[in-house]
């Protein structure tokens, strides 16, 4: 599979707005949700459809097309991933929601799990992991491993900004997984933050410091 950087003008414009130092919590939250919706649109391009006959407004039979049996679970990585959830569900409203809670050790940059709750029948579902920032790739790799351990066979990743280091880690370990990202930035700093990045996405979404 591969990395898909979404080069749509609206996506690039919105990511640019999110980089402003003085952006408000409200605006950052809104833009996160809007870009998540657009990423979900891109990630669902290959969903299969099938014909169905319905009764139209005037009582006549109308042939329409509808999604064909694609079961989806959206998997936000707490806490920042919650900021993308509504945007993805706006596009895929029937998706079930699984949750993974991970905390990063700021000294080692390793991810530690403190919560996980998955929906049933993961082996029949496509999992869309959502997290605004793909930095070192530690949290994403841990989430992928948890999904696989619970039987999930189809996984895709949606994130706003990714660092080359994180992308390299995930694509090397999981070449079968597609990654959809709004922007690929330059590098990580010594603290494991993406540059130029967005700052701490969780703090900006929740208004904490």
UniProtKB/Swiss-Prot annotation:
Q: What binding details are noted for the cofactor?
A: Binds 1 Mg(2+) ion per subunit. The magnesium is bound as Mg-PRPP.
Q: What is its EC number?
A: 2.4.2.9
Catalytic activity entry: UMP + diphosphate = 5-phospho-alpha-D-ribose 1-diphosphate + uracil
Q: Which InterPro entries match?
A: PRibTrfase_dom (IPR000836), PRTase-like (IPR029057), Upp_B (IPR034332), UPRTase/APRTase (IPR050054), Ura_phspho_trans (IPR005765)
Q: Which residues bind 5-phospho-alpha-D-ribose 1-diphosphate?
A: 79, 104, 131-139, 200
The record's annotation in Gene3D superfamilies points to: 3.40.50.2020
UniProt enzyme class: transferase
Q: Which domain of life is it from?
A: Bacteria
Q: What processes in GO biological process is this protein linked to? A: UMP salvage; uracil salvage
Q: Record's CDD domains?
A: PRTases_typeI (cd06223)
Which UniProt keywords are given for this protein, alphabetically ordered?
A: Allosteric enzyme, Glycosyltransferase, GTP-binding, Magnesium, Nucleotide-binding, Transferase
Its needed co-factors are: Mg(2+)
Q: How is its activity regulated?
A: Allosterically activated by GTP.
MF terms per GO, please?
GTP binding; magnesium ion binding; uracil phosphoribosyltransferase activity
The record ties this protein, via HAMAP family, to:
Upp_B
The record's function comment reads: Catalyzes the conversion of uracil and 5-phospho-alpha-D-ribose 1-diphosphate (PRPP) to UMP and diphosphate.
Q: Could you tell me what this protein is called?
A: Uracil phosphoribosyltransferase
Organism the protein comes from? Citrifermentans bemidjiense (strain ATCC BAA-1014 / DSM 16622 / JCM 12645 / Bem) (Geobacter bemidjiensis)
Write the gene name: upp
């Amino acid at each position: 599979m591969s990395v898909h950087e979404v080069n749509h003008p609206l996506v690039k414009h919105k990511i640019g707005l999110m980089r402003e130092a003085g952006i408000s919590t409200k605006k950052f939250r809104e833009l996160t949700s809007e870009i998540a919706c657009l990423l979900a649109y891109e990630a669902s391009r290959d969903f299969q459809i099938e014909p169905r006959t319905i009764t139209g407004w005037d009582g006549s039979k109308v042939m329409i097309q509808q999604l064909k049996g694609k079961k989806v679970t959206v998997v936000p990585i707490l806490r920042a991933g919650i900021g993308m959830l509504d945007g993805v569900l706006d596009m895929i409203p029937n998706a079930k929601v699984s949750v993974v809670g991970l905390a990063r050790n700021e000294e080692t940059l390793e991810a530690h799990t403190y919560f996980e709750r998955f929906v049933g029948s993961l082996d029949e579902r496509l999992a869309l992991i959502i997290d605004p920032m793909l930095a070192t790739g530690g949290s994403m790799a841990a989430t992928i491993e948890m999904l696989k351990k619970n039987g999930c066979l189809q996984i895709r990743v949606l994130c706003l900004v990714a660092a080359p280091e994180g992308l390299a880690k995930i694509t090397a370990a999981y070449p079968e997984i597609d990654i959809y990202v709004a922007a690929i930035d330059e590098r990580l700093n010594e603290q494991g933050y993406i540059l130029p990045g967005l700052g701490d996405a969780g703090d900006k979404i929740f208004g904490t410091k």
